[in-house]
Amino acid sequence: MKTLFKTFILLIAFLSFNCSGSDDNSALSDDVITQPILDAKKVEIINYINTFDCSGSCNYIAFGSKPCGGPKEYLLFPSSVNLTQLQQMVTEYNEMDHQYNIQTNAISDCAVELPPNS
């Protein structure tokens, strides 16, 4: 009987601690991401890229999140872009896209998108 009681107490303690923990991504995971929100964020990023002169060399960055993993596409941008700011914007978009995929139980073709050739 004591063993059963101890097991019960341990189970209750485990469930109490397991359910009370906070997720580091809880702010993002609690927000509902919609396609119009993603579209607006993408337009913001494209508009930011287009404010820079593209006469010099270009680079690319992985963009979007496929449900199977990996990027949906690659964005080309001029080397004159503030790379830190662009990376921050794209990382935020990619995280939102990943969350949207989870929320909508999205599926994809799982094809690997290759980066552009130089």
Residue ranges of predicted features:
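Extracytoplasmic/periplasm-facing segments of secreted or lipoprotein envelope proteins
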Residues: 34-68
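Bacterial Sec-dependent N-terminal signal peptides
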Residues: 16-38
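Mature extracytoplasmic domains of secretory-pathway proteins
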Residues: 57-98
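Charged, low-complexity, helix-prone segments enriched in Lys/Glu/Asp/Gln
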Residues: 30-47, 89-103
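Short flanking/linker segments adjacent to small metal-binding domains or redox-active Cys/His motifs
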Residues: 100-118
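Extracellular secreted precursors and ectodomains with disulfide-bonded cysteine-rich loops/domains
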Residues: 17, 52, 56, 66, ...
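Alpha-helical propensity feature that highlights long, continuous alpha-helices across diverse contexts
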Residues: 5-8, 21, 88, 95, ...
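Sec-dependent bacterial lipoprotein signal peptides
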Residues: 1-17
